[in-house]
């Protein structure tokens, strides 16, 4: 079934009409030219990423330039598997987080009724510290009950023997081995970003390694995928740009455009709020404080630097230069199309939180 699905997906991308009209702001989709532009920006800003070509001319797609068929980064570390204890609270339901990149707290009022445009934050739904304090309080309040059901006096801490005063039985000590499963905990991944012509969005493929010379069996890659995404959003597919059958985990792009559109809208709203605050400032120093305090989505793509006042702006409030700055602010957007893949990787990291995507974005 997977072979048939991979084949149909590949031919659907190759035969779909190529769009040359930019609808980036309205739909979250990008054209092949915009994908190349965003890829060039990613490679420039983060040199761990690079462009790559298909393994043979027959595997190339016509709507992307030779040598720029896909993006690749290698040796991305993944230190832990996504078991029940990942991110702290075992057994918690995954929480839909709609405002992760806009600096929200993920509480009530931030989760919309349609979860398609959201993404998952694992194990963060409760205050683990508060639960721990309550549990300790219950442990401390241990009393005896007599036959009549009356509570006895609470034991004082002094009555409890100190475990450090007891001698350890060497034969009873269970020593933890370095590797109880027989499988090294550290894995590395090679990440590929391709362009899906049918969905008009990027698509991520992942290929894992147990060591530099030992590929990770494809089914074990699912251990590094958030549970709700396994075999649904993330499936095992053949990589279309390589000869032969090279299985990789792939994040299906069917919802990428709607998620990216949501991120764009939220980033623009955050930027508009910052603009409104700037209009109320009375001095350059006050404006600098507003810019430094602002976080959110626009901060991910160096918008703070673009918005900051340069040393050449020394005009007093009300001067021509100050008014020109405010006019320039009105023309800016939070996320430019060439910055698309930077935000895309931040979003896609929620599918594989154990893989250190930020490693690929170090300068």
Swiss-Prot record:
Biological-process GO terms, alphabetical: autophagosome assembly; autophagy of mitochondrion; glycophagy; nucleophagy; protein transport
Region listing for Handle region, in residue ranges: 258-339
Main location: cytoplasm
GO molecular function: Atg8-family ligase activity
Annotated Acidic residues bias: 153-167
GO cellular component: cytosol; phagophore assembly site
Biased composition (Basic and acidic residues): 128-146
Region (Flexible region): 85-176
Top-level taxon of origin: Eukaryota
Location in the cell: Cytoplasm
Active site: residue positions: 254 (glycyl thioester intermediate)
Pfam families linked to this entry: Autophagy_act_C (PF03987)
Keyword entries, A-Z: Autophagy, Cytoplasm, Protein transport, Transport, Ubl conjugation pathway
Database matches in PANTHER family: UBIQUITIN-LIKE-CONJUGATING ENZYME ATG3
Family: Belongs to the ATG3 family.
Complex formation: Monomer. Interacts with atg8 through an intermediate thioester bond through the C-terminal Gly of atg8. Also interacts with the 40 amino acid C-terminal region of the E1-like atg7 enzyme. Also interacts with the atg12-atg5 conjugate.
Cited function: E2 conjugating enzyme required for the cytoplasm to vacuole transport (Cvt) and autophagy. Required for selective autophagic degradation of the nucleus (nucleophagy) as well as for mitophagy which contributes to regulate mitochondrial quantity and quality by eliminating the mitochondria to a basal level to fulfill cellular energy requirements and preventing excess ROS production. Responsible for the E2-like covalent binding of phosphatidylethanolamine to the C-terminal Gly of atg8.
Free-text comment about domains: The N-terminal region is involved in phosphatidylethanolamine-binding and is required for atg8-PE conjugation. The flexible region (FR) is required for atg7-binding.
Protein name stated in the entry: Autophagy-related protein 3
């Amino acid at each position: 079934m997977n072979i048939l699905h991979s084949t149909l997906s590949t031919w659907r991308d190759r035969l779909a009409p190529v769009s040359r009209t930019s609808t980036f702001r309205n739909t979250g989709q990008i054209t092949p030219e915009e994908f190349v532009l965003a890829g060039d920006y990613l490679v420039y800003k983060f040199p761990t990423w690079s462009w790559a070509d298909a393994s043979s001319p027959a595997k190339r797609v016509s709507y992307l330039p030779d040598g720029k068929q896909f993006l690749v980064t290698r040796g991305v570390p993944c230190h832990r598997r996504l078991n029940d204890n990942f991110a702290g609270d075992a057994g918690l339901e995954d929480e839909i987080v709609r405002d992760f990149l806009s600096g929200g707290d993920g509480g009530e009022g931030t989760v919309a009724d349609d979860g398609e445009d959201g993404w998952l934050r694992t194990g963060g739904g409760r205050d683990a510290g508060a639960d721990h304090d309550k549990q300790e309080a219950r442990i401390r309040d241990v009393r005896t009950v007599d036959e009549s059901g009356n509570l006895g006096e609470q034991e004082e801490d002094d009555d409890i023997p100190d475990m450090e005063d007891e001698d350890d039985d060497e034969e009873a000590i269970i020593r933890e081995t370095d590797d109880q499963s027989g499988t090294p905990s550290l894995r590395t991944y090679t990440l590929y970003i391709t362009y899906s012509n049918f969905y008009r969005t990027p698509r991520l493929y992942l290929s894992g390694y147990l060591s530099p010379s030992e590929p990770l069996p494809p089914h074990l890659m699912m251990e590094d995928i958030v549970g709700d995404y396994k075999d649904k959003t993330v499936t095992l597919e053949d990589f279309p740009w390589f000869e032969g059958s090279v299985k990789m985990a792939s994040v299906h792009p069917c919802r990428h455009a709607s998620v990216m559109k949501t991120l764009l809208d939220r980033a623009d709203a955050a930027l508009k709020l910052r603009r409104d605050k700037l209009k109320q400032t009375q001095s350059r120093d006050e404006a600098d404080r507003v810019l430094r305090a602002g976080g959110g989505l626009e901060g991910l793509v160096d918008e703070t630097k673009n918005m900051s006042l340069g040393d050449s702006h020394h005009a007093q409030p009300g001067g021509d230069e100050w008014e020109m700055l405010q006019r320039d602010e009105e023309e800016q957007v939070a996320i430019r199309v060439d910055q698309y893949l930077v935000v895309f990787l931040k979003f896609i990291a929620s599918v594989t939180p154990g893989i250190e995507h930020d490693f690929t974005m170090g300068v």
